[in-house]
UniProtKB/Swiss-Prot annotation:
Residues holding ATP: 47-54
GO cellular component, one term: plasma membrane
Annotated family: Belongs to the ABC transporter superfamily.
GN (gene name): oppF
The name this protein goes by in its record: Oligopeptide transport ATP-binding protein OppF
Amino acid sequence: MENQNTKKPLVNVKALSMMFKVRGTLFKALDEIGFTVNEGDFFGVIGESGSGKSTTGKCLIRLNIPSGGKIEIANHLLSGKKLTKENNQWLKQNIQMVFQDPYSSINPTKNVLTVISEPLVISKTVFGETKQYLKSLQKLSFKVKKTLLRNDIELETKFHNNFFKTVIKQINESLFNFEDLDYKDLKPSHLRQRIINETDKFIEKIRSEFALFYDFYANQSVPLQKALDDANSSLTPSSVIELKNQLKALQKQAKISKAAWDILQALKQNQKELKDYENYVHFELQKKPRIYLNTWLLTTKSYIKDSKQNMQLTDDIFAFSYNSMVDKKRNLVLILSKYYKLLPYFYDQSVFDNADQFDEIANLIFFDLVETLLGVTSLFNDALAADKVPLIKFAKFLNKLCDLRFLTLKKSFKKTRVSCSFSFNSEPEILFANSCYDLQQMPQIIKPFWEKLFNEQNYQKIIDSVSRLNVMIANYITKAFEIKKTIDEKLREFKQQNLALKKAYSANKKSEANKASINELKVNLKTLKKQLKQEKNTTKKQSKKELKPLLKEHHTALKLHDEFNHDLRKWFKKLNFMVKKYNRLENSQKKFCLVKKLKALFKKQDETLQSELRPKLKTFGVINFEYKRAVKESNVFRLVHFAKNIFKPFLFFNLTKIFMRNKVYEALDSVGLKREHAYRYPHEFSGGQRQRIAIARALITKPKLIIADELISALDVSIQAQVINILKDLAKKHNLTVLFIAHDLSMVQTVCNRLIIMHRGKIVERGSVDEIFSNPVHPYTRSLIKASPKLSKINVDLASFDENFTYDSDYSLTNMPFYIKVPNSEEHELYCTQKQFDSWIKEATPIN
């Protein structure tokens, strides 16, 4: 197993929650789950239906908006109600999802070409590539353009020679086979079959050459890259590219003095640094931290919703009081977050630091009340009937005391322009307590809790916690204003430098002392122009000599199309001749009577030889269509390469369509489909082929993460293996990270390296695949593995899955589960209580 510590984390999920509204209540589909996926991982997610697997995947790609928690993928925060424009664009390009039903992502009314290219249109990646292609053309020198023309002609000539020479040869072979056919000695049925077989054989050979069309389409942009490579490899100081660059620089430099030129360059550099610094400050110290802050607040609000719902649904006074206290604690955290509005700048990491510290201090402020309530709850279970009433009354009292403490802190919160602070006074609580209970008549069962709660040491701890909170807020505010001071000084320094450089530039621009250097530059300018002209003339002469034989060969190659049409007409004449011979031979062997003549009159049209051959001969129409398109696209590239710049924007969308189609061809090749499949519709494919199309659609934007949601569940075993092998090969080739959601444990064990097991919206076990399958500990995991069907004992296995799990029935306010690491393992962890862990570890044995 590869050491996971050497890999970079790609996906970081923390406290992810997803709640759905169901008839006025909130159903928690995901309950604060967290996991990390490293780059290049094949990460498995397994569990029964309804465990939250698909919901997790949909939250990552934002088909479901998470109710709370943090989702960070490649340092892009993707949780929260809204995404920034940049993060939204990044998400569309770098995360894709493949569903169990291919029709979830495939539109059945559109052909495969349109379906697969949809992500390119949505993410707009292909538009950027087209712009880059057109930009590279603007920088070409005269010499490189001539090289590009030569490469264009060579490509077109090669295509005509390869395709039409081969096809003409096949036509002649087919004509020879027809000539060699001795139809006089054959029966009509045998002759018919020979004609059909020969036609099928010829058409199949023609179809096998269609790949040359697709190669020609894909290679249209190759000449430009080849020309640029040739230009870069032969770059010399006297080359056209170098001369043009020098010419542009000197034209600008000749207008001003040398000193002014140097100052101008320094001014531009200073302005660029200023702009970069302002962008950094805006994004890293303002925009990005606010995004993290909003995510944290959303998570806190979802926790508050959860607490309020638990309060409404429970009929247990102790659970009600506990959830009420949790609600007050989280509302206090919301009040604390208000101080962020004072901060002009802060780091995103400070949000997480504050979140942890706020939670810790809020827990300390309410800890005495929560601890007392848990003690009362624990005592209530074993108490006598007479003691239960005062315990219930005391639980209600603790809840009201918590409300009072929260209101006291809320009212004491003071916020000014430069500070925020709380204050705490124990007097209101003591007065309230004395009004509720008489110390002399207080039940004995409550007295220990009362004495522990209402003493100076306890209240001093609360005052210390509040003071610590105030100090922490003051420190962060001070730090934020120090950052502001540093930024203001830096910006002021940049602006002062700009002013100084502008003044120096104005003073040196018309300096008489630089006349000599300006004259020298002008002389150099004239020399360079002469060099440029000479270089152009030399290139023209050389290119004429080089292009003559190429143009002659190209002209000869173009004539092959006419020769192909001529030979094809001959082949059709021969085929018609053979069909007529067959009809005569068939008629000569029939003895016609009136009844047979009437039968022949009403004979179905599709039973004749002509009707059987007609659909087969449509292939030649396809050749004509593909050739016309090849010529049209060749002309588009010729115009893009050599037309004036003013006309190129009108060709932008034509060029984009060509690039898009070529990418679709590459995607189809990568999943083992043919390029001609791009023009079919989804219903014309099998289930496995449709799933391949869905994978091609997901891969076309070259994403970093693919979420495979029960990708192979609906396919038969052999097709499952094919699809998984394709996905594994592509993941290895493109360094993809795959989140593999599945029911099939044997497949997960084969392809995944890390794994989480989900049940009822929680991760109950997680770790490496080898560690979990060699030593499954959690009862749910063991039941899943036992129920995995094996041919040797299928009757036993299918009946062994236990649906009525009660492991979580013991969880309570005083017995909360947490993650515990399994001994002698690297990352194998269980979600359980310590008592359960000790029991399960003893009982855990390998499952065969």
